[in-house]
């Protein structure tokens, strides 16, 4: 079965939307997490969050913390929500953290390799995706998991995300 599912729920670029849209998206996020956290737990799904959580409103962070706590011991599907995330942000953040370790003398430049970079990515500890499904008729990856998608199969569909069903997954 599927062990990991990553959803690109809110990109760093979404912060540039009009304020009323951002507020609406944050309310949708909080309501969805509040409504679904217990269902995730009952279905043995473990929730993870990647991205710049400091950018989220406090009420959203608090709701996410509760859901993470509720599902922390679950051993089934790993559901990874990318919130306030972009691939460029992730790579820049990883490079900055590696540079900081070099500056502190904890890491030698000569020892930096692909494994080092992967350790500093938000997805450290998760396998690279095997399949990326892009819905809504878009034909781009939109700054999502730029490093991790290197060898993934890419599937594009006109089906909108809210309408995406099990049959669509099998088709992919």
Regions found by a protein language model. Give the residues of each.
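Flexible, compositionally biased loop and terminal segments
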Residues: 1-172
């Amino acid at each position: 079965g599927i062990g990991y599912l990553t959803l690109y729920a809110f990109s760093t670029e979404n912060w540039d939307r009009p304020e009323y849209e951002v507020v609406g998206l944050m309310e949708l996020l909080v309501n969805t997490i509040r409504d679904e956290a217990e269902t995730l737990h009952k279905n043995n799904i473990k929730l993870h969050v990647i991205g710049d959580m400091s950018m989220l409103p406090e009420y959203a962070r608090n709701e996410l913390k509760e859901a993470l706590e509720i599902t922390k011991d679950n051993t089934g599907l790993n559901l990874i929500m990318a919130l306030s995330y972009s691939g460029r942000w992730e790579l820049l953040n990883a490079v900055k953290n590696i540079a900081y370790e070099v500056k502190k003398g904890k890491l030698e430049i000569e020892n930096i390799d692909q494994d080092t970079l992967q350790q500093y990515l938000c997805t450290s500890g998760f396998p690279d995706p095997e399949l990326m499904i892009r819905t809504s008729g878009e034909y781009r990856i939109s700054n999502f998991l730029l490093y991790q998608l290197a060898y993934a199969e890419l599937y594009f569909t006109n089906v909108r995300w809210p309408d995406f069903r099990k049959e669509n997954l099998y088709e992919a």
